[in-house]
Amino acid sequence: AAYRAGFDRLQTDAPVSRQIAEISMAAAHQCHRKWRELEWHLIGCYREGMDEFEMAEGLSYAMFPGSIPNFVDACGVWLNLIRDGRVEPGPAFRLWAETEGQGGFDEVS
């Protein structure tokens, strides 16, 4: 709660939109493998009504400084938020969440 309250205070009169601030922080936490904080900001993106394709694009930019494996893990965090019913996805991302066999190499063995 204190983290979100601090983030809210920082956003007062900020020169960037709340959506951009949320996805930027999500991408930064992805680079540092801070999965709980990533969840908070993905949920914040949904709360702000951000387009899911723009969210995916925002996270994809973090592949360069934060690595592809971190991006893949971040997508897993997002996928679990959808599957656990913690966010309400649009049709395309609901279909993504309902698609089986996305666990990496587990399905091969």
Where are these regions (language model features)?
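Residues at alpha-helix boundaries and short interhelical turns
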Residues: 14, 31-35, 49, 69
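Amphipathic, charged-and-aliphatic alpha-helical interface segments
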Residues: 20-35
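A cross-kingdom feature marking solvent-exposed beta-strand/loop segments within repeated
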Residues: 40-59
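Substrate/cofactor-recognition hotspot
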Residues: 61, 66-69
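Short acidic/histidine-centered micro-motifs embedded in hydrophobic/aromatic stretches
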Residues: 27, 58-62, 74-77
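Short acidic alpha-helix initiation/capping motifs at coil-to-helix transition points
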Residues: 1-4, 31-39, 66
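Acidic, glycine/proline-rich low-complexity segments that act as flexible tails and inter-domain linkers
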Residues: 1-20, 46-47, 71-109
